[in-house]
A protein has these predicted regions:
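Short secondary-structure junctions
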Residues: 1, 51-56, 159-163
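Short, charge-patterned binding micro-sites
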Residues: 3-35, 64-65
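Short amphipathic beta-strand starts and helix->beta connectors
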Residues: 10-19, 60-68, 112-128
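Ordered, amphipathic secondary-structure segments that act as subunit-interaction surfaces
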Residues: 26-80
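Helix N-cap motif at beta-to-alpha junctions
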Residues: 35-40, 86-88, 140-143
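Short amphipathic alpha-helices in soluble, non-transmembrane regions
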Residues: 40-51, 90-101, 149-153
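A contiguous pocket-lining binding segment that forms or flanks enzyme active sites
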Residues: 79-115
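Core RNA-modification/binding signature centered on pseudouridine synthases
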Residues: 100-198
Length: 198
C-alpha cells in the first residue's frame, strides 16, 4: 500500500462517485495507490479476504500511465428506485410530467447549506417497470443529482407518491453514456464495451 507524504501519512485510496448513504450498490469503484506493482488478481483476492459479508470484489484492473481517470470513466449511473406502495399509473404520470419539462429544480441540504439541483437536466433515461419500480440513468454533473432527488421531483409533481417511506435505491452500474444512446446501457469502464444494465 502506498501512503501520502507529510506529517500524517494515510493510505492512497480514492472512492469515485460513492453512492448516497443507505443506498445499495452493484457498482462501486475505488483506486488504490500501491508502492509496488502487483498482480491485480492477487490484490482482488487479498481484498476479498478482509471485506465483510456482502462486499465482494468483482474486478480489479491495473491503471497504466496516461490512462483516463476513473472519474472520467464513471460519468453516469444507472439506478433502480423502489417507492413501495405506488400506483403504476400515478408513477407513469409523474415520470411523463417530469420528462416533458426542460427543467425541474429541487432543493437538498448539503454541508454548505441548502442547494438547488436541476433534476431534469441530469436525466438520460427514466422509466417505470411493470412492477412499479423506476429505472433511472443519470449523468454525473456538478452539482450531482442523486436518485433521491429524482424521487423528490416526482413527489413535487404528484404529492404523496409512494407514501412517506424513503425509497429503496440500488445502483446497477456506472460508466459513460454512449452517443448515440442505446436504452438502458452504459459503456463499461474496464472493458469499454456497451453494458446492458436494464
Amino acid at each position: 500500500m502506498a501512503y501520502s507524504s507529510g506529517f500524517n501519512p494515510h493510505p492512497r485510496i480514492s472512492y469515485a462517485n460513492a453512492s448516497p448513504t443507505s443506498a445499495a450498490s452493484e457498482a462501486e469503484y475505488l483506486e488504490l495507490g500501491l508502492s509496488d506493482r502487483c498482480d491485480p488478481a492477487k490484490v482482488g483476492a487479498a481484498l476479498d479476504e478482509v471485506l465483510g459479508p456482502g462486499l465482494d470484489v468483482v474486478e480489479v484492473a491495473e491503471v497504466l500511465p496516461g490512462a483516463a481517470s476513473l472519474n472520467d470513466l464513471l460519468a453516469a449511473s444507472a439506478w433502480r428506485i423502489e417507492l413501495g406502495q405506488s400506483d403504476p399509473e400515478a408513477l407513469a404520470s409523474a415520470v411523463g410530467q417530469l420528462l416533458s419539462r426542460d427543467e425541474l429544480v429541487v432543493q437538498r441540504m448539503t454541508k454548505t447549506g441548502l442547494r438547488d439541483f436541476d433534476v431534469r437536466g441530469a436525466i438520460v433515461e427514466l422509466r417505470v417497470t411493470p412492477e412499479g419500480a423506476l429505472l433511472f440513468l443519470g449523468r454525473h454533473e456538478v452539482p450531482l443529482v442523486r436518485p433521491d432527488d429524482v424521487v423528490t421531483a416526482l413527489r413535487l409533481l404528484v404529492p404523496g407518491l409512494g407514501g412517506e417511506r424513503p425509497a429503496m435505491l440500488t445502483r446497477l452500474g456506472q460508466g459513460v453514456v454512449a452517443e448515440p444512446h442505446a436504452a438502458g446501457t452504459l459503456v463499461d469502464p474496464f472493458s469499454g464495451e456497451l453494458a446492458q444494465l436494464f
